[in-house]
């Protein structure tokens, strides 16, 4: 028996197919000539060609076996070592300024130097193993910091006031410490105070007023919160009283 097959497509559907065949994709351009005699070749825009050769394979084929490393070895080494330089630079400059760099050191001084070297090694190790994490965090912090650039003048003035208020106790501590411990106390004092000043500047720039302590305002807020909770506990209506029909 011969299968009599009649097409169910209307003339409108056939016209749409002819239009779609002759349409040109503006993004891809003209279709290249396709030789149907060669079975191994496929039209470049066919679905099978897309599956067999995805867009990412072109980059992988031309990589010649090399892996994409976003953090090369030399860059990691340079940035990690830079953190050590920034950590040690203030102390070295201060010791050079005081003309006390490796001069007349006793057991206490060498102990401090050993502790300082151990801290430098820990910082270098942390910077190396957590390179991707802390670089991304620093990048986000810098972007957020630059968005708050209008707060920089006020933050700078607050840091300046902070230095004035704490300056007199620092001088007093330096005089009390004496000649023997004066160098170490002064060095630790400078480092700690510099770190505190930088932290205050960053905090006041990102969130103005966050470093100020207003005890009365906080007490008022806590008292108001407690009073609100106290009122809500006594004014809360049980569900049974709200729905008397549920008891019935």
Curated annotation (Swiss-Prot):
The chain crosses the membrane at residues 73-93, 110-130, 152-172, 186-206. It is found in: Spore membrane; Vacuole membrane. InterPro entries: WTF. It is a multi-pass membrane protein. GO terms for biological process: meiotic drive. Coiled coil: none annotated. Pfam families: WTF (PF03303). Residues 30-68 are annotated as: Disordered. Keywords: Membrane, Transmembrane, Transmembrane helix, Vacuole. Its main location: membrane. GO terms for cellular component: cytoplasm; vacuolar membrane. The keyword Transmembrane helix applies. It comes from the Eukaryota. Homomer. Interacts with other proteins that exhibit high sequence similarity. Acts as a suppressor component of the dual wtf meiotic drive system, and can suppress but not confer meiotic drive by compatible poisons. Wtf meiotic drive systems promote unequal transmission of alleles from the parental zygote to progeny spores by encoding a poison and an antidote from the same locus; the poison is trans-acting and forms toxic aggregates in all spores within an ascus, wherease the antidote is spore-specific and targets aggregates for degradation by the vacuole. Belongs to the WTF family. This is Meiotic drive suppressor wtf1. It comes from Schizosaccharomyces pombe.
